[in-house]
C-alpha cells in the first residue's frame, strides 16, 4: 500500500511487479557502481600533479569525440 511521502515503490501485487522491483534494484546498483567509478576518475584526474601539455591543447580530439556520437 502506498503511503504519503513514501520514498520507495509500493508493495508488489503480481509476480511481474516483483521481477520489475528486482530489475530496478539490479539496475540501480549498476548505475551506482558506474557513477562511483566516474567520480573516482574525476577526483584522481583533478588531484594529480602530473599533466600532459599535449592533452591540454587538443581541440581536434574534443571536436572529434563531440561530433562522432552525433554522426553515429
UniProtKB/Swiss-Prot annotation:
Q: Which GO terms of the cellular component aspect does the record hold?
A: mitochondrial inner membrane; respiratory chain complex IV
The subcellular location is:
Mitochondrion inner membrane
Topology with respect to the bilayer: Multi-pass membrane protein
Q: What is this protein called?
A: Cytochrome c oxidase subunit 2
Q: Does the keyword Acetylation apply?
A: no
Q: Which family does it belong to?
A: Belongs to the cytochrome c oxidase subunit 2 family.
**A GO term for molecular function:** cytochrome-c oxidase activity
Which species? Lepisosteus oculatus
Names of required cofactors:
Cu cation
Q: Which domain of life is it from?
A: Eukaryota
What is the primary gene name for this protein? mt-co2
| Mitochondrial intermembrane compartment residues | 1-14
